[in-house]
A protein has these predicted regions:
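An acidic-aromatic
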Residues: 87-139
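Beta-strand-dominated lipid-handling architectures at cellular/organellar boundaries
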Residues: 73-79, 86, 100, 117, ...
Length: 275
């Protein structure tokens, strides 16, 4: 697969990625007995949300990407730099550490830069949502990258509702399922560490399906985080996957997250890059 296919993979991946207090009640008592406070047992999704990774920044300098698009694949080194609620930069450096492709996610938009061909695509989240038929926001993409449970376009508190059901996936994990809007969600949670192991997002009707798996969890300081992430997206038009190896992660340190200047690049469209 030629390196100019990398930008097509990166473009489709941008479409994919864009996409608790204790509850207490009082029991009635008879006579003069004092009222007892009963704490409602937390669901596994509540406990998982409380234990989910939380950090202000992350730097992955030795990331390894295995990319596949329309049955063609390529491997590339790269980096990931993120400042929470501000920006995430994914850089691909397939040749001698030279950056050829870049994906920038900010609350305002998504920027895909093909440095090899000196062109770029700038997309709003509304455009991305229309492309994948799923409501995507920056917060959703950020939560996916932070290995958190995501209900597209909504708060995680939706997972506290009775509509979210839990069942044993195997002896070591539990599956939490919920349907919101036109999307079916399934999350597999480790029973011991409460880490998110897999998330499936399936659009009803003719929509696509995205799956994100997280594995190789290690403790980096006080942050439990996966060292391997695999993202797949499949629909009638796209078949794309990306495996990311993250052997060296630094949390809550300084991050170089300066945006690229695209004034000397040619603006193009996502369809041009994908064709």
């Amino acid at each position: 697969m030629k390196y100019n296919h990398l930008i097509a993979v990166l473009a489709v991946l941008s479409l994919v990625l864009m996409g608790c207090n204790n509850q207490k009640r009082l029991t009635k008592t008879e006579g003069n007995e004092p009222k007892k406070e009963v704490v409602k047992q937390k669901t596994i999704q509540q406990r998982a949300i409380e234990a989910q990774p939380d950090f202000q920044s992350v730097n992955a300098q030795k990331a390894r990407f295995q990319l596949s698009y329309q049955r063609k694949s390529v491997a590339a080194n790269g980096t990931i730099a993120m400042i929470k609620d501000s920006i995430c930069i994914i850089s691909l450096q397939p040749v001698l550490g030279i950056e050829l492709f870049r994906l920038e996610l900010t609350p305002a938009d998504v920027l895909i830069v093909d440095k090899m061909n000196r062109r770029y695509v700038q997309m709003s989240y509304a455009e991305i949502s229309e492309a994948v038929k799923m409501p995507i926001t920056f917060a959703d993409a950020q939560n996916v990258l932070m290995a958190r449970m995501v209900v597209l376009g909504q708060s995680q508190s939706v997972l506290y509702s009775p509509a979210a059901t839990a069942s044993a996936a195997d002896n070591n994990s539990t599956t939490v399922s919920i349907t919101e809007g036109k999307i079916n969600y399934q999350y597999r949670i480790d029973n011991s560490s409460l880490a998110l192991l897999q998330a499936d997002y399936t659009a009803n009707g003719r929509g696509g399906k995205a799956t994100v798996t997280y594995s190789g969890h290690n403790l980096f300081g006080n942050v439990l985080f996966p060292t391997a992430v695999n993202v797949t997206y499949l629909d009638s038009k796209y078949d794309v996957s990306c495996s990311i190896s993250l052997p060296n992660l630094v949390f809550n340190g300084s991050v170089n997250a300066a945006r690229i200047n695209v004034r000397t690049y040619k603006k193009t469209t996502i369809s041009t890059i994908l064709n």
